Structure formats: structure tokens, C-alpha cells
């Protein structure tokens, strides 16, 4: 139990694992999983650890997925990319722009690996992965069987996919297929992007604006450990939203296609005057209330207590109960984040 997980999670929480293995191809990943499983150990497959909170020491093997490679197929209507799960997401965004293949610019600077992107259906500034995903290649861990799911079969939802449900723990993502249409259409619905002129804007300008918004609002994990947005933006019924807006008319709200309404968790937290609030070594970030940071050698229990406090305060004021976006990892695998902080 002496392999530190601190370098393998962006929160910088110091817990240990029994074994840590880096897998650079599918076979190494399968071998590591099968060996650990035969020993009766739990196994956790990790990308860059940018969306996890380790609650305690992990009693098993952590496999770091470092399967690399980018293949490009140039078709008349679009560029098709086949990207290894271990590639860094932001580096991929930069690479596609440099190569004149726009479409990912709204998703710039999202931390983590390409293989993690479908699990959460990552999204930012009006674009989600499902907009550009063609397929996801995974491997069934017990049999080594390769499975390709179309974007539809991935059952993407808000920060959700089949990989959080039926496919969790049984399959490992090894590659993601992306489709970037040659007829580029900017998405300028959020934040500073609304100020850009859709008739003249370039992909590089969108990329620059997104990077500027993220770097000014979000803490650098190398300075203050964090896992990005700690909570999901709550999606509520139209009735709930109407009641809330009659009391708080300035509350940011985003009507969804199905009639529900997405609220801004950061705004709700901010209204409770929680920016800068600290418990132990964990704090609510002063610029972006949606982010909890490791201010000073935080322990996982500091983060859990702080998240509980934030959830309670928002729930009491707005009757909206936040759910963590970050995944909570216990001694033998993922546990319910909502139950942990309730």
C-alpha cells in the first residue's frame, strides 16, 4: 500500500494504491486488469485523474490508460479522427485547429484524456462531446472482445453516458472516433462568446476566447489542486424554475429541448456567499464558486465536508440540491457522491 496516488489525481489528494500500472496499449491494459482480477483485487482505470476524488487508500490496482495515436481520414463532408484514449484532450483540440480541422474549440482546456470524454459527455460553452462523437471503441475486460458503439448507442446525456451505467467497470475505452464537419458552424451562445460576430469569427478566435475565460476564472491544478467543476449544473422542471425565477429574477437559466431548465450551480453557490469559504485545507474558489480547491494540503474529508456544507446552504436557500460532477472513489471502487455528501 505504498504507491502514492498524489501524482495521478489533479486534486492532489494524498492516498495510496496497492499497485499502479501504466498501460500503453490495449494488451498491456488487459493483462494488468486480468492479473489484478485473478488476485482478487479491485481495479480502477484512470486517465489523468482530473475528475476524481479519492476518499481513502485504494485496495487494488490503478491502471493509467496511456494508449496514444491519432489517425485522420479526410472525407468530402468531414474529417474523421480516430484518437487513442490516452491522448490529452486539450492537446488534441490544439492539434486539430493547427491542422485546419475546427469543431472542438469550445471544448478547449477541459482537463483530462480523450478516453474520459465520452464517460462524462464533456461539455463547455454550448458544445458537448456528443455533437462531434462518431463512435467509441472499448474492450470488454473479462474477454478481450472489442466493441464499437455509435454515438447513439453511447446514450449520451448531461454529464452522462452508458459508460457510467451498464458499461462501467466491465469495459475500458481504448479510442474515440470524432467527426468534424468541413462546414464549420460557430457556437457562440455562452459567456464572452456572445460578443463575437458570427459572420466574421474564426475558430482560432473562439479558441482564444474560451481559453481566456477558463484561465481567468478557473484555478490551475498545478497551483491549487482541483477537479474542475465540482458540481453539475442542476436541471429542474419548468415549474421549479418558474418558482425560483419569481423570487430570484436574475438567476441565469437555460431552457432545454425537453422543457426542463438548466440552472447555473456557480451562481446558486455564489448567492449563498460561499466564495473563499474554507474547511480544513479545502476551499471554495474565489473566482469560480463551482470549483472546490485544495488550498493547503487538503484531506479528502475536508473536501467532503466542504461539499456537504455547500450543498446544504444551496438546498436551504433555493430548494435545489446539487449533485457532484466529480466521481468519488472509495477503497474498492466508485461510491455514490451524492450519498457521501448528503
Curated annotation (Swiss-Prot):
One example GO MF annotation: flavin adenine dinucleotide binding
SUPFAM superfamilies for the chain: FAD-binding/transporter-associated domain-like, Uridine diphospho-N-Acetylenolpyruvylglucosamine reductase, MurB, C-terminal domain
Domain FAD-binding PCMH-type per the UniProt entry, residue ranges: 13-183
Keywords, sorted A to Z: Cell cycle, Cell division, Cell shape, Cell wall biogenesis/degradation, Cytoplasm, FAD, Flavoprotein, NADP, Oxidoreductase, Peptidoglycan synthesis
Disulfide bonds: none
Catalytic activity: UDP-N-acetyl-alpha-D-muramate + NADP(+) = UDP-N-acetyl-3-O-(1-carboxyvinyl)-alpha-D-glucosamine + NADPH + H(+)
Pfam families assigned: FAD_binding_4, MurB_C
Residues bound to substrate: 190
PROSITE patterns found in the cross-reference section: FAD_PCMH
Pathway(s) where this gene product acts: Cell wall biogenesis; peptidoglycan biosynthesis
Entry superkingdom: Bacteria
Cofactor requirements of the protein: FAD
Active site, per annotation: 159, 229 (proton donor), 325
GO cellular component: cytoplasm; cytosol
Family as reported in the entry's similarity comment: Belongs to the MurB family.
Subunit structure comment from the entry: Monomer.
Purpose: Cell wall formation.
Name the UniProt record assigns to this protein: UDP-N-acetylenolpyruvoylglucosamine reductase
Taxonomic path: Bacteria, Pseudomonadati, Pseudomonadota, Gammaproteobacteria, Enterobacterales
Gene name of the encoded protein: murB
